[in-house]
Amino acid sequence: CKSPGTPCSRGMRDCCTSCLLYSNKCRRY
């Protein structure tokens, strides 16, 4: 999975945690 802070797109499930919609980056926790 992608590390925290990595740019992500809405609807993607590639983050280790989840994607922040307002910043389009993976959450830290």
Swiss-Prot record:
Functional summary from the UniProt entry: Omega-conotoxins act at presynaptic membranes, they bind and block voltage-gated calcium channels (Cav).
Keywords on record: Calcium channel impairing toxin, Disulfide bond, Hydroxylation, Ion channel impairing toxin, Knottin, Neurotoxin, Presynaptic neurotoxin, Secreted, Toxin, Voltage-gated calcium channel impairing toxin
InterPro entries: Conotoxin_omega-typ_CS
Keyword Disulfide bond recorded: yes
Additional facts recorded: The sequence shown is that of conotoxin GVIIA.
Cystines in this chain: 1-16, 8-19, 15-26
GO CC term (a single one): host cell presynaptic membrane
Gene Ontology terms, MF aspect: calcium channel regulator activity; ion channel inhibitor activity; toxin activity
Positions bearing 4-hydroxyproline: 4, 7
Subcellular location: Secreted
Comment field on protein domains: The presence of a 'disulfide through disulfide knot' structurally defines this protein as a knottin.
Keyword Cell inner membrane: no
Protein name, UniProt field: Omega-conotoxins GVIIA/GVIIB
Tissue localization of expression: Expressed by the venom duct.
Primary location class: secreted
TM region(s), chain numbering: none
Source organism (scientific name): Conus geographus
